């Protein structure tokens, strides 16, 4: 995974692009809003400084091949409405974790489902991933439904030692991509 340029992805109505400093307000909102973070334990970015620091950190991690973090925007609009990423790559680069968040004003419209499909396709086809994992809260029904729609299955018996309320799902590369 060495990219000269950030791999922008598009769907019929979305653009998944590189995170920019100008996205700081949405980053701050997504990482600080109580509704968005109800099931997530992570550092907030409740100030412009913290949000910009987060963006700089993400872009440094991209340059060192640790993360692919896409800003989700509606096609032909620049405004960030959410994010989706592949990160926490295994040592052999065959497994990655997927993470995502979305402004509540845009939820329940298929946006994250559409984003996840294009990111999974990219991960399996272009990165050569064999498996993608997702860690989600056991009571986050919307996230669980999204994962199941995208063929993730619950990994029985696997736990997150840092948070026992987290359940772990995984999806394998589809046979048609295996080549």
What are these regions (language model features)?
Residues 60-65:
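Short loop/turn motifs at secondary-structure junctions and domain boundaries
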Residues 37-57, 68:
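Conserved GNAT-fold acetyl-CoA-binding loop/helix
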Residues 1-38, 69, 73-179:
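Acyl-donor (CoA/ACP) binding surface of acyl/acetyltransferases
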């Amino acid at each position: 995974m060495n990219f000269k340029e950030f791999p922008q992805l598009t769907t019929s109505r979305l653009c998944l692009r590189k995170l920019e400093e100008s996205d700081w307000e949405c980053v701050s909102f997504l990482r600080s809003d109580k509704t968005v973070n109800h099931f997530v334990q992570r550092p907030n970015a409740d100030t412009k400084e913290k949000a910009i620091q987060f963006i700089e950190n993400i872009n440094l991690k991209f340059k060192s091949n640790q993360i692919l973090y896409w800003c989700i925007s509606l096609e032909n609009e620049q405004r960030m409405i959410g994010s989706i990423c592949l990160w926490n790559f295994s040592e052999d680069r065959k497994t990655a974790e997927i993470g995502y968040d979305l402004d509540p004003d845009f939820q329940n419209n298929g946006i994250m489902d559409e984003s996840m499909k294009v990111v999974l396709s990219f991960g399996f086809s272009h990165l050569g991933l064999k498996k993608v994992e997702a860690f989600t809260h056991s009571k986050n029904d919307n996230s669980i439904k999204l994962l199941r729609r995208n063929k993730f299955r619950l990994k029985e018996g696997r736990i997150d030692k840092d948070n026992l309320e987290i359940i772990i799902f995984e999806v394998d590369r589809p046979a048609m991509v295996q080549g």
